[in-house]
Amino acid sequence: MKTSFSIQAWEEYLYFQTQDKKTLKKINELIKDIERNGALNGIGKPEKLTNNLSGLYSKRINDKDRLVYENDFIVILETVKFFL
């Protein structure tokens, strides 16, 4: 299965490479897990998104960040950061 990143996701991925190795490690684990187990199985509490995000899936990176991706072709759209 091929993995690619949107421009925004790639910029965030590069940020994590220099600023947050723990999060980067988790993102890499999630990508490998998606390749092995598919979109709705495995670690990270996989979730099928709805409404305007229909057709996309997410997995938890940590309590506040999510990895958002497509199913058949892993396209990392973004790592969503939720701020309270």
Question: What is the role of each PLM region?
Answer:
Residues 2, 11-24, 58-66, 70-84:
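Enriched for short, Lys/Arg-rich terminal
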